[in-house]
Amino acid sequence: LQSKDSADTAVYEGELMSQWGGASFKASDAPAKASVTYGGETYTGTYRDSEYRMGNSYITHYYTGDNCYEFGINSENGKLVGINFQTESFYKKESAASELRNARERAEEVARECAANFVNLEECGEPTVSVVPLGDESGAAMDLYQYFFCRKLNGIETRAYVAVRVNSRGMLVSFSLGDLDSFDKMEADSARFDSLNIEDEIRKAFQNIHPFPNGTIVEGPDIDRAFYAVTPQGETVIIAAAQATFSLQQTDENSTQDTEPIGAG
């Protein structure tokens, strides 16, 4: 949803979401080699590919690391926007390490230490946390803790975030950054969305774009998630993912069809 002023909204279709959700590509202006520093250590790598990550205004260039699995940089300023540390040596250390009794507490400490390098944690509030059970190379049980630190505007998430993954042995697995540099623009433009009723706009979108001309919305739409973002074209938008259930009316009097849930973003 994009608002030019408080009374003018529009629903983006096709082009923008294809750009954000498109496949990776080779960028002709990406440096063949790059180096970044994190935690006092320098990581070097060879260019692999690029993509517009969902909700970011910039292109991310990805590099296959010499001493990490991969890292990403902001194409506009060369800043580090993420590292995955999972090399063969990482897996060996992981298998040799022991499970921590206070695994969750230690994981959060590690995640906060990482995120604090990039964002003021007091501006994010409490992170959302998810736990994924998995195993190490030897097959031993292990948990992966995923932390999401996010700045919000009027209770709505923004793409100014830091996502951190830590295993139950206290090892930092990876981190990735959203569009931190665009928060000020999102904040400045947010007043233009004050009168916007997201639920109403989503309902209009379903009524206008759903593929069943004989269908009627019988449930929803329910918004799964919404967040502020800045497009690659420099416009502040609210991206909302929602789903609704339609009742399909058949033209054949002898045929019937159950309601069918349809999702839209």
Feature-to-residue mapping (PLM):
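Preferential activation on post-signal-peptide N-terminal prodomains/segments
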Residues: 1-144, 148-155, 159-161, 165, ...
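Compositionally biased, intrinsically disordered linkers/stalks adjacent to structured regions
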Residues: 200-247
